[in-house]
């Protein structure tokens, strides 16, 4: 993504996406209704939206680390079924037949964040698909690859860490530390045997944590309780509510019986009269 300028520096329009086709051709997708601003045969200057690209780059590299973390925590039978990377978040679909437990989500996050903190260097190389797979790279099932493919690797000599090696043509960080931080927001079912994780990285993690802190502060004020007493306070409120609910139900039954006993001619008609 980025912007298009005239040769004299005047802004022309925005680029919403860029795709590489047939190996060497780059297609720039313009925002809606902006195609008419481009004139055939005219030279333009293209400018990358650096901040947005960096966020996309961070999220893209994070999907590779997430993929390997899932395989390490859940088992090597886990495989990628799809993904979506934007400047706001990442989405990763994978094969697994049940919901992730809180413990599994915690372990997956911890492993990805540990790899981020160690600032592992990214390396890339060109190879044939067969060479890449024979050397341990992961390829997407059913994906069509050119004769030569780009292999992205995040490696470490420590066997307890992630070793990510995948066929990929996208933009990536030079080292994992640039991702900053990683946080899983949700785990949900997409279809039978396929689950979806949505997650955020870097600055978005910081925003997410700050929002949670502010929410906790508001709850502390409402409950008039310290942070370590919030859970206990809510449990006590639930107990009081259930007692009140049971007491109210008993009072209603008692009142009905009292009315009937005092005047046997009174009865309760629950039918609804239709308007004439």
Predicted regions, residues:
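A glycine- and charged-residue-rich anion-binding loop/surface
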Residues: 1-276
């Amino acid at each position: 993504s980025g912007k298009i300028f005239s040769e004299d520096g005047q802004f022309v329009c925005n680029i919403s996406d860029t795709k590489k086709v047939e190996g060497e051709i780059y297609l720039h997708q313009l925002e809606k209704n902006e195609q008419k601003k481009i004139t055939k045969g005219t030279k333009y200057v293209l400018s990358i939206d650096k901040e947005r690209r960096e966020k996309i780059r961070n999220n893209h590299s994070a999907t590779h680390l997430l993929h390997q973390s899932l395989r390490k925590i859940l088992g090597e039978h886990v495989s990628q079924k799809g993904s979506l990377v934007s400047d706001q978040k990442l989405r990763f679909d994978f094969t697994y037949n049940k919901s992730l437990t809180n413990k599994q989500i915690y372990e997956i996050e911890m492993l990805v964040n540990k790899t981020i903190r160690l600032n592992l260097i990214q390396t890339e190389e060109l190879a044939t698909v067969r060479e890449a797979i024979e050397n341990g790279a992961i390829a997407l099932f059913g994906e069509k690859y050119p004769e030569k493919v780009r292999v992205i690797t995040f490696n470490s000599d420590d066997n307890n860490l992630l070793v990510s090696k995948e066929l990929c043509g996208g933009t990536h960080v030079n080292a994992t530390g640039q991702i900053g931080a990683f946080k899983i927001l949700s785990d949900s079912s997409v279809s039978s045997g396929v689950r979806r994780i949505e997650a955020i990285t870097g600055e978005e993690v910081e925003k997410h944590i700050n929002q949670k802190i502010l929410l906790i502060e508001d709850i502390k004020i409402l409950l008039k309780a310290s942070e370590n007493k919030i859970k206990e306070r809510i449990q006590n409120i639930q107990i009081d509510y259930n007692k009140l609910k049971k007491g109210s139900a008993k009072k209603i039954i008692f009142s009905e019986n009292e009315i009937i006993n005092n005047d046997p001619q009174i009865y309760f008609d629950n039918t609804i009269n239709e308007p004439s």
